[in-house]
Amino acid sequence: MTPSLANFLWSLLWGTAIVVIPVTVGLIFISQKDKIQRS
């Protein structure tokens, strides 16, 4: 695997992580908050 290809794959991985992790945390936070408001 060439270094440029490795860098490209790493940047894709980090890009995905940077987008997915906050979204997941946000959804969990919102669902927890909704549960508290409903009960």
Swiss-Prot record:
Lineage summary: Bacteria, Bacillati, Cyanobacteriota, Cyanophyceae, Nostocales
Biological processes annotated in GO: photosynthesis
Subcellular location(s) per record: Cellular thylakoid membrane
Gene assigned in the entry: psbX
InterPro entries on file: PSII_PsbX (IPR009518), PSII_PsbX_type_1_subfam (IPR023431)
Subunit structure as annotated in this protein's UniProt entry: PSII is composed of 1 copy each of membrane proteins PsbA, PsbB, PsbC, PsbD, PsbE, PsbF, PsbH, PsbI, PsbJ, PsbK, PsbL, PsbM, PsbT, PsbX, PsbY, PsbZ, Psb30/Ycf12, peripheral proteins PsbO, CyanoQ (PsbQ), PsbU, PsbV and a large number of cofactors. It forms dimeric complexes.
Stretches that traverse the bilayer: 10-30
Keyword Signal: no
Membrane topology category: Single-pass membrane protein
Keywords: Membrane, Photosynthesis, Photosystem II, Thylakoid, Transmembrane, Transmembrane helix
Domain of life: Bacteria
Name of the molecule in the record: Photosystem II reaction center protein X
A Pfam family it matches: PsbX
Function: Involved in the binding and/or turnover of quinones at the Q(B) site of photosystem II (PSII). PSII is a light-driven water plastoquinone oxidoreductase, using light energy to abstract electrons from H(2)O, generating a proton gradient subsequently used for ATP formation.
A GO-annotated cellular component: photosystem II
Species whose genome carries this gene: Nostoc punctiforme (strain ATCC 29133 / PCC 73102)
Similarity comment text for this entry: Belongs to the PsbX family. Type 1 subfamily.
